[in-house]
Amino acid sequence: MAYDARMRSLLALSVVACLAACGGGTPRPTHPVTRVVVVGAGMAGITAAHALDAAGYDVVVLEARDRIGGRIHTVDLAGVPIDMGAAWLHGARDNPLVGVANAYGFTHVADDVDDVALAVSAVEGPFDDREIADAFTVADRFFGRLPALRRQLGPEASVADGSDAYFADLALTPRATLLGRAMLERSYLELDYAAPLPLQSLRWVDEDPTLRGGDRILLGGYGQLVERLAEGLDIRLSEVVTRVVYDDQGVTVHSTSGAMSASHVILTVPIGVLRAGTIAFEPPLPEEKSAAIERLDLANLEKVVLRFETFFWDELEDNSGLVMSDVDGEMPGYYDLTSEAGAPTLVVLYGGDYARSAQATLNDEELVARALANLELLLGRSVPTPSATYVTHWTTDPFSRGSYSFIPVGASPADMDTLRAPVADRVFFAGEGTRFRTSSTVHGAFLSGVEVARTLGVASTGIPTAPSR
Ligand SMILES: Cc1cc2nc3c(=O)[nH]c(=O)nc-3n(C[C@H](O)[C@H](O)[C@H](O)COP(=O)(O)OP(=O)(O)OC[C@H]3O[C@@H](n4cnc5c(N)ncnc54)[C@H](O)[C@@H]3O)c2cc1C
């Protein structure tokens, strides 16, 4: 879960321990490690490369885009750095990246956007505080009911099936049902897990442990962290990898400017890229791994960022709003980012089915127009023209093909283990979608990078960490 908008019972997870122990479960390579090519300069690839480089290995990173960071992308929006991909360090107390950010001297601030301050429906109008609090309770209880719903509906049920069954049993008024469902389905499930609800597996939703300590935002953007970790590395940009050939002698990685030989390759490209088949493997990946890749998928969280000259949304200050327009799932989540950005800024989040269809059919102008129309609905008044806007396209970007992984109906966390398993002791895999318990997050990508470096023999990652003061 990348966007942790819901207060849940806290389950401690000592991810920090992974910094010391990760890699122990995967057998060490039997071939000597002489040169490693890392495919992808996102958090997983940069972390692995940093650790290998610090340990004295020869390592080269090939990155398809003309920038590093991958799904971390801090953009200067009219003089203000805004994160268009990952924005939150989830669970400050358990998140290993908080220690890394501390050690590098970055400033991060608490940013728990759990509260929905405003909710409105195009049909029912605005909801009051009592109704919002009740809907929050109704939505939250769904997660406590998951074991019973799974027993009732079976292993092939989707989250949409679960939500239908849950609300069928609650004798709520139509108005309370509308808001309760929007709180659960739009605000939590489609913005956290972000895939269309009929595709999300009921069995595996909400099985990722919540990290303790609340969420934080890095002032100046997440990009700084990845830039800092990448310092001094041999990174080749605009190198689209198209083919990986491996045999007993080593690997050859083919990309835009030619071919590079190495003893090992680490692929950190998103599952969406592996599914698309734009990287050929010779010989083909084992049937079991290809089948796992086919079963897994990426979700579709997208953002529209609205920057204004003046701040005019007092009722949303440091908070969030939930919109139910007349189009199902259309841009439901509004988040005030003004204090973190240092300028009047709203981030509009949307995911699920709506994101898939809107990304395929609407242009940027239309997406901004929909975001502004829904903002007017939320505030109940007209709004000025933004001074700057930014629209993301993670879903259609050929180098991400979605936002982050989720477990679809018919898949299971074991598929991520299968994806992670090395092939022929030459081809290694890392990235957020290769470790279920921390999947869909930046710290998951980071830990996967640490893990693969350790598997290749790195004893110390050389990545500094310091406690919060
Ligand atoms: C909108 C959005 C919001 C998010 N919010 C949060 C959040 O608040 N908190 C959080 O923890 N996580 C969040 N995430 C998830 C987080 O961004 C990812 O889990 C994490 O950044 C993934 O890192 P990675 O290294 O595994 O993959 P990536 O960052 O995707 O890196 C893979 C790299 O491979 C490159 N690549 C792809 N194909 C090729 C090729 N053929 N040849 C060479 N290179 C290639 C890509 O360009 C990319 O740079 C969010 C993601 C999105 C999209």
Residue ranges with predicted function:
Residues 3-4, 12-16, 23-469:
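FAD-dinucleotide binding site
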